[in-house]
């Protein structure tokens, strides 16, 4: 009697079967390729061969036949789950080292579980129909990894997640090759980094030819030369501290490509704090390296808008799944939260972060109360997976060695190599701004009057409420003048259009008055240049970043002016912002606020005020956890709970779609039953965050309507072309940085 084929997949287009044997072997080949690249030979083969053994269950075979209208013997099934079987076999084959693979095997569909869930899984009986013939031998655990994990127990969770990444990406890729062959063909065909380095060198040479021999351009050339020299160094952790205007972005990319080529890396990753910076950085890189070599990946991205060619858009969409691309431009949220994720979609990319070069732009924006797990994750990727890191900013945080906090220590990186010698004194040579700290507090009317006296001015404040109050008090702009408001009361689409309009207006004849009132979303990295900047009191890093928008290009005949002020009756919001402001006030007044030593002193004071570098947050049961409690005990790893807890930005609000431009038409399509991921992603560009309490107020007033799980503002009078959502309530006091 012919043995019945164990089915893994059925291609719907032609009802072709893929046997479980073929699928497992295919996954094993992919996974072995990936695990060898992370120094774990044999592990990919082991994982691939075991991961779908559970599909041999009668119940699963009945299920897959019923779902595809294939006749079955029994006609029904009780339990189609299958992932747990691979974990059971790993436990049987590999009793001492099974946790290395059991988490990945048990979670290759639903996500890596907590240890208690894994224990329950391993109590299940092994189904009698599972064949024990031809099972793979258990691989050896490399001695170097064992040594590293004994000295740093937190490294284990990242190693297991990396193995998981290798397995789930292999599983997806083999399944795609069988089920969607046209899609699979779109992967690959990437330009190597040598060619991209050549394109950058050509671009820099053209820039040098076209640029006058000014002191600023001489400094930019000097910074580039320092990056060339440093890039020859070993795989390591580096910093690039360059004042605004010193050519930091292209110099850091030059360093990354040179370093990557020297050490045989496959990609460079630019991690950026704000989507407003990503958009401009990605545009610059696409112009240099070509559309086909730069992958932009963040929550607000619409590939069909960025890429005109449908095939190119699809290729990039596929690349966002696993980051198999030479240059990635992404957010800190996307990168760092993936390193603590537990589900396949977020973890697929992790093995492609191994053997890469990561640039962290505006490093001072990394959240202080998450610094310990961030440092530990990056330290692991450096030590176990040969990743080089470069932290770039004009306001470098102190992340090396032991740093004293209020009640605990921050255990920083072992060593960070600074590229620019202190003796160069770039902060003096690139000085373009004079800081002035106003002693007396000032009210909304007075600050608005001050702004009206300026021809071109940027005012940055701490909260959405303050931005709205000051903007509303500006007099009507005189003929030919422009007034702009920027805050997260505006949806991303609205913000981007306004930012673009501001940049275009600033490039016009200098006689055009331009006044901008903004929250801190334009503070770091946004390419704007004003002769005068006002900054509400804040930490020194924020003040210097704001000053970086002042006389940015050094075109003024004298120093630009940055005014730091206190708002009457408006203290700095509690929490990190308040600690930052207090740290600045606690400092002895330095001779030069822009000197690197001033920033070192500031961060020393700042860290002393931080209550924790590993903040506790509630899981879905309301229990408080820190990452140390969840992932630093090798016998009690809690991957699923850590995924819930680790959020770089508090995201406790509710997204509400605003009636702005295209969103009105998109809403109609949703109401007509068009439910797909592309439409939902487009709508995300038109959302503003509300707290639960304010959402209820809007709902009760009939101004918001739920449609297919999304909330829509239906009262268009509540959304203004200038300021976005009009709502005078306490929650506008909250800061929101994305």
Protein language model regions, located:
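Accessory nucleic-acid engagement/destabilization modules that flank
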Residues: 2-202
């Amino acid at each position: 009697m012919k043995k019945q084929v164990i089915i893994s997949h059925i291609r719907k287009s032609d009802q072709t079967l893929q046997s479980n044997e073929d699928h497992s072997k295919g996954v094993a080949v992919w996974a072995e390729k990936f695990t060898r690249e992370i120094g774990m030979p044999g592990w990919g083969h082991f994982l691939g061969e075991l991961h779908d053994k559970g599909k041999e269950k009668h119940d699963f075979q009945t299920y897959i036949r019923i779902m595809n209208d294939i006749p079955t013997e029994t006609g029904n099934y009780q339990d189609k789950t299958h992932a747990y079987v691979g974990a059971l076999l790993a436990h049987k084959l590999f009793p001492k080292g099974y946790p290395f693979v059991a988490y990945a095997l048990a979670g290759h569909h639903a996500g890596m579980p907590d240890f208690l869930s894994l224990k329950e899984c391993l109590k299940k009986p092994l189904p009698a129909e599972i064949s024990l013939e031809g099972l793979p031998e258990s691989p050896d655990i490399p001695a170097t990894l064992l040594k590293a994990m004994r000295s740093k127990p937190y490294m284990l969770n990242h190693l297991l997640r990396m193995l998981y990444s290798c397995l789930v990406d292999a599983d997806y890729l083999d399944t795609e090759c069988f089920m969607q062959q046209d899609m699979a063909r779109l992967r690959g065909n990437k330009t190597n980094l040598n060619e991209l380095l050549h394109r950058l060198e050509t671009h820099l040479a053209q820039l040098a030819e076209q640029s006058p021999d000014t002191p600023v351009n001489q400094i930019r050339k000097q910074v580039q030369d320092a990056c060339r020299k440093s890039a020859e160094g070993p795989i390591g952790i580096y910093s690039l501290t360059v004042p605004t205007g010193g050519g930091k972005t292209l110099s850091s990319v030059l360093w990354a490509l040179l370093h990557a080529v020297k050490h045989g890396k496959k990609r460079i990753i630019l991690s950026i704090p704000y989507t407003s910076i990503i958009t401009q950085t990605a545009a610059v890189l696409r112009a240099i390296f070509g559309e086909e070599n730069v992958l932009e990946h963040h929550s607000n991205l619409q590939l069909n808008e960025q890429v005109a060619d449908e095939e190119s858009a699809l290729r990039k969409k596929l690349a966002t799944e696993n980051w198999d691309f030479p240059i990635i431009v992404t957010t800190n949220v996307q990168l760092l939260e993936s390193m603590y994720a537990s589900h396949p979609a977020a973890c697929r990319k992790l093995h492609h972060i191994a053997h890469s070069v990561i640039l962290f732009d505006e490093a001072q924006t990394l959240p202080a109360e998450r610094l310990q797990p961030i440092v530990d994750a990056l330290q692991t990727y450096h030590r176990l997976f040969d990743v080089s890191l470069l932290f770039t900013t004009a306001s470098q945080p102190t992340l090396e060695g032991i740093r004293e906090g209020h009640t605990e220590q921050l255990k920083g990186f072992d060593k960070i190599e600074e590229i620019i010698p202190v003796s160069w004194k770039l902060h003096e040579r690139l000085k373009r701004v004079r800081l002035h700290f106003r002693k007396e507090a000032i009210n909304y009317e007075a600050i608005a009057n001050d702004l009206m006296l300026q021809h071109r001015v940027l005012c940055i404040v701490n909260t959405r409420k303050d931005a709205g109050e000051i903007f509303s008090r500006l007099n009507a702009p005189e003929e030919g003048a422009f007034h702009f408001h920027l805050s997260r009361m505006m949806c991303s689409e609205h913000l981007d259009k306004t930012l673009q309009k501001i940049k275009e207006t600033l490039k016009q004849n200098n006689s055009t008055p331009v006044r901008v009132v903004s929250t801190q979303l334009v503070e770091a990295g946004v390419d704007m240049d004003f002769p005068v900047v006002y900054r509400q009191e804040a930490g020194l890093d924020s003040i210097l970043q704001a000053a970086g928008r002042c006389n940015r290009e050094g075109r003024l005949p004298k120093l630009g002016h940055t005014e730091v002020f206190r708002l009457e009756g408006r203290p700095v919001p509690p929490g990190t912002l308040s600690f930052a402001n207090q740290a600045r006030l606690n400092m002895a007044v330095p001779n030069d606020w822009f000197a690197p030593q001033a920033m070192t002193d500031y961060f020393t004071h700042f860290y002393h005020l931080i209550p924790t570098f590993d903040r506790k947050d509630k899981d879905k049961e309301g229990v408080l956890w820190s990452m140390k409690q969840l992932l630093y005990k090798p016998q009690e790893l809690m991957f699923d709970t850590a995924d819930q807890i680790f959020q770089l930005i508090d995201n406790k609000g509710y997204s509400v779609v605003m009636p702005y431009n295209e969103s009105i038409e998109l809403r109609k399509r949703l109401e007509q039953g068009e439910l797909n991921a592309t439409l939902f992603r487009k709508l995300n560009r038109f959302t503003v965050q509300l707290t639960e309490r304010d959402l209820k107020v809007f709902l009760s007033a009939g101004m918001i309507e739920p449609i297919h799980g999304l909330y829509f503002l239906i009262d268009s009078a509540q959304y203004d072309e200038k300021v976005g959502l009009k709502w005078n309530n306490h929650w506008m006091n909250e800061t929101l940085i994305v």
